[in-house]
Amino acid sequence: MLTKPDRKAIRAKRRRRVRNKILGTAARPRLNVFRSLNNMYAQLIDDETGVTVVAASTLSPELKETFKNGGNVEAAKAVGDLVGKLALEKGIKEVVFDRAGYLYHGRVKALAEAAREAGLDF
């Protein structure tokens, strides 16, 4: 009998494999994306020092009142735009995109494209 694959385990395996290959620096931090059922989170992380340089989410004060549900494509676009603007304010233009094992589709894709439109290069 065939068993259904555990999607969370597959994502975790993909995440570990990718994280071994990418590294964020002070000059080019890692743009990490986390997707929960009701919210989207994005961080720029300098892995050399272990510091989060910029963070944005649907729970950020700038966006919290805008969306009733932060777990949709429109909210992801807003988070991508916000993280891009905050990064440019800190003088960061180039990042390494870390989709954290999520497929490049839907909310993850919308966040990435909005960050690119805001001025980030990856």
Swiss-Prot record:
Entry's Gene Ontology molecular function annotations: 5S rRNA binding; structural constituent of ribosome
Membrane-spanning ranges: none
Pfam families: Ribosomal_L18p
SS bond list: none
Keyword annotations: Ribonucleoprotein, Ribosomal protein, RNA-binding, rRNA-binding
Alphabetized SUPFAM superfamilies for the sequence: Translational machinery components
Matches recorded under CDD domains: Ribosomal_L18_L5e (cd00432)
InterPro entries: Ribosomal_uL18_bac-type, Ribosomal_uL18_bac/euk
GO BP terms in the entry: translation
Statement: the UniProt record of this protein carries the keyword RNA-binding: yes
A single GO cellular-component term on record: cytosolic large ribosomal subunit
Protein family per UniProt: Belongs to the universal ribosomal protein uL18 family.
Biological role stated in the UniProt entry: This is one of the proteins that bind and probably mediate the attachment of the 5S RNA into the large ribosomal subunit, where it forms part of the central protuberance.
Subunit structure: Part of the 50S ribosomal subunit; part of the 5S rRNA/L5/L18/L25 subcomplex. Contacts the 5S and 23S rRNAs.
Protein name in the entry: Large ribosomal subunit protein uL18
Gene: rplR
